């Protein structure tokens, strides 16, 4: 062994090596942090090159990937990132990375170092900007995260001899190889997240499809689910078709029971977001605190009981439609928070500081008079103008009489399918239903059909079996009575129910009786009784005769409830006569 070989490194050399090692560790630490926080690791490569330049004097970084990844693909790389080079995005990779170098790394799968590109490959094989005699190059392979034996790309960096350091050392090769390894791990992690997300979305789509198939027509999601051909409903459908393709917020207005969610789903189904999620929130069903957590989500530990992170409805509806039902019921304090999301498309989870951006279309619905609420200071004017970009007024059922029969048939078919029955409506039953006003709109019509089908004695429902023919239709009485002198089911009604939304609809007319009752003969005034015990058999019979043997009418004459009349009939063993 010579003296030169046995001679230990000088303190100055050891100090220089220690500084270089520390700089390399600092660079790797910064790069690892950048990749860990990056949603797209490839997009952070220019920043990585800046770190390498600052800490290790590695200039002119290049990341090139295969244009056609695969085992049999040729070497035809395209540049993803290149720093310190003035080049257009369409320029070939050979402008910043010699083809010969790319072929060597892609085919061998090992790092490549050149201390003089021109001397090694010839001037014609090296881009003009890289022909300086002092230009050196290091290139390491970037492997496919799923197939480690397959080279996906090349990570390269240049250094000029005219800098303080010349050429490359083994340490430089190791550092750049570790950077490539960090990039591979980040790509593998992001691919795994993307696969898991796609799998979760596919599971969600599959479950939604299963639920939709099980519900059948109960949850229509397109214009095909809207039943009716009346001019009023045709105008609404035309408006939905016109506005669905835009990004504008839609405000559905109308009385309770007019089917706002059905029309909101129709807007979603006709829009470019049809394949995205449709998320519904009933704003009236939640308190202000719960509504904030439900819409925005919350971080783990944000409040007592928040044992895990929960995404809000805005996040779940990203790329789709969020249906805010009963938006007129939210508190003034929460309106300002909602306004910010609608204006800027961003929010923070409850208990969190990270701002989340979403792309969600808003469809809101209300049966309140929002203009009056704004005038009274109960609803923010700026929020009103934000949600009321495209208002669509849904007509009440009494304004679309021709749609009642097909709707009733739809509900009857649904009842038969759900209960394995074959109940049908007689023609006079359909006629009777079509004469009703239905202040509860489509929801009340559905209840009416289901009640009649469930209580029917036979396979055909007759007109006299309907509640309105028996004087037991509460909603019909609510519309007929003008004062509160007559109790209905024990409740005094003070006024006629009117729509809460201002629409150009004529006042409802009382449903005419199918058969005019014979004029009652003069009789003595029946004294009011409030207790069944005070009622005599004769008084009850006299009231029934005057009322044409209709229990509800007899109850009103006696100032009693139908239940009390039924109890009195049982007590006195009186059978109702059919007239």
Curated annotation (Swiss-Prot):
Entry binding sites for a divalent metal cation: 468, 473
GAF domain ranges (all copies): 40-187
Region (7 X 2 AA tandem repeats of X-P): 505-518
Keyword Repeat attributed: yes
PROSITE patterns xref list: SIGMA54_INTERACT_1 (PS00675), SIGMA54_INTERACT_2 (PS00676), SIGMA54_INTERACT_3 (PS00688), SIGMA54_INTERACT_4 (PS50045)
Region (C-terminal DNA-binding domain): 537-579
GO BP terms: nitrogen fixation; phosphorelay signal transduction system
Renumbered ranges of Sequence repeats: 505-506, 507-508, 509-510, 511-512, 513-514, 515-516, 517-518
Source taxon at top rank: Bacteria
Keywords assigned by UniProt, alphabetized: Activator, ATP-binding, DNA-binding, Metal-binding, Nitrogen fixation, Nucleotide-binding, Repeat, Transcription, Transcription regulation, Two-component regulatory system
Residues reported in the UniProt entry to bind ATP: 254-261, 317-326
GO function terms (MF aspect): ATP binding; ATP hydrolysis activity; DNA-binding transcription factor activity; metal ion binding; sequence-specific DNA binding
Location of the region described as Inter-domain linker in the Swiss-Prot/TrEMBL record: 464-536
Domain Sigma-54 factor interaction as annotated: residue spans: 226-454
Region (Disordered): 502-529
Pfam families: GAF_2 (PF13185), HTH_8 (PF02954), Sigma54_activat (PF00158)
Composition skew (Pro residues), residue ranges: 505-520
Annotated DNA-binding residue span(s): 551-570
Function: Required for activation of most nif operons, which are directly involved in nitrogen fixation.
Quaternary data: Interacts with sigma-54.
Record's protein name: Nif-specific regulatory protein
Originating species: Rhodobacter capsulatus (Rhodopseudomonas capsulata)
Encoding gene, per UniProt annotation: nifA1
């Amino acid at each position: 062994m010579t003296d030169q070989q046995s001679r230990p490194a000088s303190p100055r050399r050891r100090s220089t090596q220690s500084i270089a090692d520390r700089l390399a560790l600092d660079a790797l630490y910064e790069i690892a942090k950048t990749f860990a926080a990056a949603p797209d690791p490839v997009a952070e490569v220019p920043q990585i090159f800046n770190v390498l330049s600052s800490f290790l004097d590695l200039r002119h970084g290049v990341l090139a990937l295969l244009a056609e990844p695969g085992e049999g693909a040729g070497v035809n790389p395209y540049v993803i990132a290149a720093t310190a080079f003035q080049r257009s995005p369409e320029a070939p990779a050979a402008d910043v990375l010699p083809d010969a170098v790319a072929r060597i790394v892609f085919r061998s799968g090992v790092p490549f170092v050149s201390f003089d590109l021109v001397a090694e490959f010839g001037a014609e094989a090296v881009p003009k900007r890289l022909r300086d005699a002092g230009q050196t190059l290091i290139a390491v392979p970037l492997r496919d995260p799923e197939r480690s034996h397959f080279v996906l790309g090349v990570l390269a960096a240049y250094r000029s001899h005219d800098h303080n350091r010349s050429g490359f050392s083994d340490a430089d090769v190791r550092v750049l190889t570790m950077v490539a390894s960090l990039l591979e791990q980040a790509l593998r992690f992001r691919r795994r997240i993307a696969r898991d997300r796609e799998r979760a979305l596919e599971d969600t789509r599959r479950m939604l499809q299963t639920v939709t198939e099980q519900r059948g027509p109960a949850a229509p999601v397109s214009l095909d689910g809207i039943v009716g051909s009346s001019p009023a409903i045709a105008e609404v459908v035309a408006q939905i078709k016109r506005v669905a393709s835009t990004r504008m917020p839609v405000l559905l207005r109308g009385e309770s029971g007019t089917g706002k969610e059905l029309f909101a789903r129709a807007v979603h189904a006709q829009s470019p977001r049809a394949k995205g999620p449709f998320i519904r929130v009933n704003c009236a069903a939640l308190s202000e605190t719960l509504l904030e957590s439900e819409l925005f989500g919350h971080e783990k530990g944000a409040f007592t009981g928040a044992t895990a992170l929960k995404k809000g409805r805005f996040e779940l509806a990203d790329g789709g439609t969020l249906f805010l039902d009963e938006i007129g019921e939210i508190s003034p304090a929460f309106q300002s928070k909602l306004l910010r999301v609608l204006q800027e498309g961003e929010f923070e989870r409850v208990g969190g500081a990270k701002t989340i951006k979403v792309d969600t279309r808003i469809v809101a619905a209300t049966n309140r008079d929002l203009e009056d609420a704004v005038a009274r200071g109960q609803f923010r004017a700026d929020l009103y103008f934000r949600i009321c970009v495209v208002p669509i007024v849904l007509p009440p059922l009494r304004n679309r009489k021709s749609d009642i029969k097909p709707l009733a048939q739809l509900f009857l078919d649904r009842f038969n399918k759900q209960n394995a029955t074959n109940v049908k409506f007689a023609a006079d039953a359909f006629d009777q239903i079509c004469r009703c006003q239905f202040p509860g709109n489509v929801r009340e019509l559905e209840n009416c059909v289901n009640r009649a089908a469930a209580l029917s004695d036979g396979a055909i429902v007759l007109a006299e079996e309907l509640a309105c023919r028996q004087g037991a239709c509460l909603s019909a009485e609510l519309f007929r009575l003008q004062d509160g002198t007559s109790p209905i089911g024990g409740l005094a009604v003070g006024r006629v129910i009117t729509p809460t939304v201002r629409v150009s609809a004529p006042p409802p007319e009382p449903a005419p009786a199918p058969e005019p009752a014979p004029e009652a003969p003069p009789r003595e005034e029946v004294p009011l009784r409030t207790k069944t015990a005070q009622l005599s058999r004769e008084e009850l019979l006299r009231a029934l005769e005057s009322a044409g043997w209709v229990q509800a009418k007899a109850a009103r004459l006696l100032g009693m409830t139908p239940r009390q009349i039924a109890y009195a009939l049982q007590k006195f063993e009186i059978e109702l006569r059919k007239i």
